[in-house]
C-alpha cells in the first residue's frame, strides 16, 4: 500500500512503480518481527538494494499464516545458509585478488589456506551470532502466524492493535493478475500510538 501511482489508477493497471525520489535507511531490529498484523516498509530486492533501504512511500500489512515447528526449522535453516553466504562473500571479497594470484602462480597451498581461513572465520562469527528464533517467537508464529521468512530483511515499524478484522477483510479481497485488488481498498484514517 501507499504507492502514489495507485491513486486514481485505472483498473487492471500495475501499480507500485512510482518513486518519491528518496528511500529510508533500514531500521531492522530483531525484536520487531513479521507477526500477523505487523506494519512494515516495502523495499526493492537485495540485488539492487543491498543496504535494505525502505521505500519512501510503500508499506505492507502482514497477514501470513501459522507455521509448524518443522516449517519454522526449515525457515531457520534457509536464513542460516543465506547469512553464512553473505558473511562468506563479505570476508572473501577483500582476499579475492590474493587468492587469484596464488592460483595463477601455482601456490595452491596458500590459496587453500586462505579458503580455510575464510571458512573458519565464517563458522566462528556465525557461532557467535546464529540465526535462531526464540521459543516465544516460534510460539507466536505457530499460534498467531505471520511471515517469519521476512524477519531480518525488512523494517517493521508498527502493528495493528485494534481492528484485526479489517486486515482479514483486506486479505479476502479479490485481486487481478497484477495482485492488485479488483476494487480499490482505501484507508480512510489511521491512529498512531506510542508504546
Annotated model-derived regions:
Residues 1-195:
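Cyclophilin-like peptidyl-prolyl cis-trans isomerases
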